[in-house]
């Protein structure tokens, strides 16, 4: 039997599914996954990959409100993309992202994510591009430049019609802003 993919809203996840998700994220990120990171994972849509009843892959799409230069936009922000170690390099991550693209296309003006160096190749393969514009984050009521994040944030739009050199301003949240 193959891998089964399910799309669910956080409100539809059972306690045991949330616990399995947390365990997968801690393992997949080798312990470098904070409580803030987990909070960022909740409150939106999840695409989950199962091998029978075992959760082996996950990605979340969370609604965020940002600005593209001076224009407010609704963003589907990708969080907590992970595939269990023994299931990697089998196309599961690609399938998770293809389904993510469909959700973003139907619900948001733009898709964004903060990619690890290892993840960029996968995201490029499903149409995501490095954001070339300046990045800003809200800190104590003022926007400051997120220089350390530049080159790691990627964007995707179904029709491709977005200026990837425009400045992006992200909303405020606990933990990492991007």
From Swiss-Prot:
Domain of life according to the entry: Bacteria
Role of this protein: Catalyzes the coenzyme A-dependent acetylation of the 2' hydroxyl or amino group of a broad spectrum of aminoglycosides. It confers resistance to aminoglycosides.
Biological processes per GO annotation: response to antibiotic
Cited SUPFAM superfamilies: Acyl-CoA N-acyltransferases (Nat) (SSF55729)
Lineage: Bacteria, Pseudomonadati, Pseudomonadota, Gammaproteobacteria, Enterobacterales
Organism per entry: Providencia stuartii
Reaction catalyzed: gentamicin C1a + acetyl-CoA = N(2')-acetylgentamicin C1a + CoA + H(+)
Binding site for CoA: 81-83, 88-93
This protein's name: Aminoglycoside 2'-N-acetyltransferase
GO molecular function, one term: aminoglycoside 2'-N-acetyltransferase activity
